[in-house]
Amino acid sequence: MVKAVAVVRGDSKVSGSVVFEQETENGPTTITWDITGHDANAKRGMHIHTFGDNTNGCTSAGPHFNPHGKTHGNRTDENRHVGDLGNIETDAQGNSKGTVTDNLIKLIGPESVIGRTVVVHAGTDDLGKGDTEESLKTGNAGARPACGVIGISA
């Protein structure tokens, strides 16, 4: 079992953690998040970005992690970036908790996401359905108010 965590924060009141767990290299990864301080009753994009570099804030994290050269999509789509996690949904206080299982995201092997950055976006991810070139790259999820590098945990 490999476990990893990203402590998410930035130049906003959005903060929290995203925990990853994977039993075997070919097995699925469980992703659990607890994010607070976002807009109330909203859907907000969350992605794994290529670089674990936050020296210039969350912008240094680069584009979505996309080792297979696919277009942007929903977490459940066959055609998507590995880093596409879709939207998290916030409650009336702007908080979001949830768990999903994903077959593309890996902690073990050459496409591991360890050392990369989780970004919580300011806008709703259109899941690549926005009919624009930008939609196919980013989902038009907007600014990056909070992020954190994924690190190995006990």
From Swiss-Prot:
Binding site for substrate: R144
Uppermost EC category: oxidoreductase
Intrachain disulfide bonds: C58-C147
Keywords attached to this entry: Antioxidant, Copper, Cytoplasm, Disulfide bond, Metal-binding, Oxidoreductase, Zinc
Binding of Zn(2+), residues: H64, H72, H81, D84
Subcellular localization: Cytoplasm
Entry binding sites for Cu cation: H47, H49, H64, H121
Gene Ontology MF terms: copper ion binding; superoxide dismutase activity
Matches recorded under PANTHER family: SUPEROXIDE DISMUTASE CU-ZN -RELATED
Subunit: Homodimer.
Protein family (similarity comment): Belongs to the Cu-Zn superoxide dismutase family.
Its biological purpose: Destroys radicals which are normally produced within the cells and which are toxic to biological systems.
Protein name: Superoxide dismutase [Cu-Zn]
Species of the source: Podospora anserina
